[in-house]
Structures are given as C-alpha cells and as structure tokens.
Amino acid sequence: MSSNPFRIQNPQPQPQRQPRDLRKVNQQVQAVDLKVQMKMKNIKYKIGVVSGKGGVGKSFVSSNLAMAIAASGRKVGIVDVDFHGPSVPKMLGVRGQMLTADDKGINPVIGPFGIKVVSIDFLLPRDDTPVVWRGAIKHSAIKQFLGDVNWGELDYLIIDMPPGTGDEALSIAQLVPGITGFVIVTIPSEVSTLAVKKSINFARTVNTKILGVVENMSHFVCPSDGKVYYIFGEGKGKKMAEEMGVDLLGQVPLDPSIAEANDAGEPFFLKHPDSPTSKEFLNIADKVIKIVESNQ
C-alpha cells in the first residue's frame, strides 16, 4: 500500500440514494417565509437600528428609542438579533428572565412600558457562553424570532442589528416584508463616519428607507456650569448627514449615569427621565413617529 495520504482510493459501492424532491424543500422554505409574513402583517412599523461599526452605543439607542416610543402610548416590541453581543435585555432591565412557549409559539419577555422583548441572551445557559454560529444558522434564528414569536398586534417593532452590513442585516432586509426603514447610529469620529456611510449605502442597495442618523456621544454638558464640550469634535454627525442626504434625528449627549445604569441592568430612560439624554430620546422618538406615520 502506498504511503501517500492523498492517494485516491477506489470508492466502495454505495447504495443508491433517492434524489431529494426539491419541490418539497421549496414548499418548506415558502411555509417558513409565509409564517414570518403573517406575523409581521400585525405590526404596523418595522424599524432596524444599525451601525457601521461596534462601540457606538447602538443597542443603547435601540433600547431607549423603544422606551421613548412606548412612552407615547404605542405598543412596541424589540428583537435583538445581535447574536454575538446581545445587550438589549440588560439595558431594558429584564436580563435573567426566560422565554416561554405554548402551542401558539414563543412568548416574549415583557419589559418596561409593556415592551415585548426577544433576545438570544434569554436562551444562553451562562453569561460567558459564546454564540458560535455561521450565517445560515443565524438566518434560521432570525426567521424563528420573527415568525415563531407571539408578537401580537404592535405599532412598532425595533430590530437591534449587529454592527456592519453582514448576514444579519441582509437577512432582515430580505425577511421583513415592507420594512419601514433603518435608523443609523454613529459617534462624532472620522472612523465611525466612514463606517456609517457604508451602512447608508447598504440601505440604499437593498432599497430600504433611511429614517435618519442618531449621533450618540455627541457632546458633554458640564453639570456645574452647563457648558457644552464636544469631546470628539463638533458638528461631524450633522455634516455627514448633509453630505449623504439623510436626516439627523438627534444628538445624544455623553452622561456618566448612562454607564452606571447599564452596568446595573437598569433602564436609563426610566431611572433618569428628566435627564438631557432622556429628553433627547423623546425628541428622536417624536421625529421617527412623525416620519413613519405621516407616510401612511
């Protein structure tokens, strides 16, 4: 016998396999997609929150935007499809709870203002358990989160997406029928601005409306004298929005109490309702509501 490990061996005769009936496979795929369509039909507005890069506070914006919209009396849900870094449950103060299921499907966790929350974080056995999934598995999980969850009738579904324009963003654009649009999160830095331009061009590539840009960490207001400091530079978000022909929805200030609330797993919007940050989220929510509901 040759010692060459790459030598081609004569294959043993294999029993004949029946070819797969691709028509049945296609029917199964269509059935899953139809389930998503049926669930999404009961939701008036579906908004994806995206960012070109990580570390810009996208999930913080998603969570507080959801609370600000819900505070107006509208019925809101939020689905966290940032599988590798799910943080929405902690920011909404519902971390550690579990998803339940019945014969109708998966029941979401109920958060502040009655917000329906779904996240992979509810399914992980430990805090440090990684999610090691390829694109196809993530696509299937997104289908489940959209089609198997008992969302009921909602006014808004906020979709917290991972950074970048990869598999999850493409899956959402393909799976969510009549997606209302994207809110894009940035910070006032050149690196983030470049990444955001890619997100804007991605949205245009998949023919999805851009509702506007939120500039997070925009400035710092000194609590002693009220003076405003632009730590990362002034006017970068506004300039970029003008260059790309999109709306600047708002500029969220830096606030040390944001980190304190997030670390404690307490919803910032609830804990500090009178803060400049919470008031800015109310302004952003008001703009989003006017943009999407005036286009009915």
UniProtKB/Swiss-Prot annotation:
Renumbered residue ranges of the record's region Disordered: 1-23
CDD domains, A to Z: Mrp_NBP35
A molecular-function term among this protein's GO annotations: ATP binding
Amino-acid positions noted as binding ATP in the UniProt annotation, renumbered to this chain: G52, K53, G54, G55, V56, G57, K58, S59
GO cellular component, as recorded: cytosol
Compositional bias of kind Low complexity: 1-17
Residue ranges the record marks as coiled coil: none
Swiss-Prot/TrEMBL keywords: ATP-binding, Hydrolase, Iron, Iron-sulfur, Metal-binding, Nucleotide-binding
GO BP terms, alphabetized: iron-sulfur cluster assembly
Function according to Swiss-Prot or TrEMBL: Binds and transfers iron-sulfur (Fe-S) clusters to target apoproteins. Can hydrolyze ATP.
Additional notes on this entry: Although the second Cys residue of the CXXC motif is replaced with Asp, the protein has Fe-S carrier activity, suggesting that individual cysteine residues in the CXXC motif are dispensable for Fe-S cluster binding.
Family: Belongs to the Mrp/NBP35 ATP-binding proteins family.
Assembly with partners or alone: Homodimer.
Stated name of the protein: Iron-sulfur cluster carrier protein
